[in-house]
Amino acid sequence: MKKKNQTWKYFVYAFLVTIAVTFIFHKQIGYWITDLTIKYSNKNTGQGLNPEYDVGEVQPYSTAAAAEAAFRAKDVRARGQISIPSVGMSLPVYQGLNDVHLYLGAAEHSRREHANPEKNGNYILASHYINHRGSLFEPLVRVKSGEKIYVAFNDKVYEYEIDGLYQISVRDDSWLQDEKEKKIITLYTCVSLYTPDLRWVVRGHRVKEYELNESLPQHIVNSFAIDSTLKGTYLAAYEYLRPQ
C-alpha cells in the first residue's frame, strides 16, 4: 500500500510540474497580450464553478488546499484580470468567493448586481496571502498611495488610484459595505498565516476608464503581461505532494 501511495504521489507531482510550466512561465492567464491590444481568451472550455459568497465557508490557507486548487484549475474560467504594475502583480479575476478561486487569482466577494467595475459601488476582491514574494495578494503589502490598479472587464479597462494600505481587524466589516454612490475598489487578504485576526486592505477610487482595443496605452497592456503571480500556489502544491 505504501509503495502504491508513493507511485501515486510521483504521478501527481509530475502532473503538477507540467501545469506549473503552463501557469507560471507563460504570460497568458486567460488573456492574449500583444504589442497593441489585450483580448479575452475563450480557450478555457471548463464549465466553471458555482459562485459562492459566504466568507465563513472559506478555509485557512494550507498546502493541501493549494494542491487541490492546482488540480481544479481546468474547471474555472476568469471573467477579468487585475494588475498593479508598481508591485508586479497580475492575476485573473473569478466570479465568487471559494477556495479554488482564492488560490488561483482574485475572487469577487459580493453577489450584488452592481458588484463589478462597470457599476457604481464597492468592487471587492479577495485572495490568499502566501509567504512567497510576488504570489497572489502578497504584493499588496508593498503598495503606496497614488499608485494605480487596472481591472480589465468585458470590453473596458478601469483605472483606480490607491488611497492607502490598512491593517484591520477581521471583525471590522465596514470596508466590505456597499458604497452605491462611489466608484471604489477594495482588495483584502490575510496579514500572515500566524495572525488570523488581522487583514490587509487596499482601498482605491476609480479615476478613468479605457476601451479595450488598440488604443489602450502601452503601459497598461504591459501591466497585464507581467509574469503570473501564481507561483506560490504551485510551489505549495509541490511541497505537499513531493515524494519523500
Describe each PLM feature range:
Residues 2-244:
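Solvent-exposed, non-transmembrane regions of membrane-associated and secreted proteins
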